[in-house]
């Protein structure tokens, strides 16, 4: 579990940098249905395979979306907390809390989507200056220290790109 200190107006750029390094099997949690669609659109425009999961989507379409994620047809899911409970997709290696979860239960259920059944996984929490005290409260209530993560710089991103080119 890590947190990324980022101002609200830099969140999308920070997210894109993180996804340059890790973009397969990702759930990005946001607070509103509107943000699920606008963020997914921005990520699609950046070349990512993305789907949306929120309360406005009919159950059969949600199940289809989860199935596509499981099979690798999509790599990134932008979701409201409707997806937090009960979702078990082996491919999920990264959970990003794009919007801060203000209670321990929501946080626990969100990050529980990765690293299930002994698998490895990572959770990143975006925090702005107004949310720093909530971060400390979250650490206290979960009794876990959440370490700070730096936004990936160009060198790290380029090394990852080179590694992908070499492996292909």
What residue ranges belong to the model's regions?
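Conserved helicase RecA-like core
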Residues: 1-168
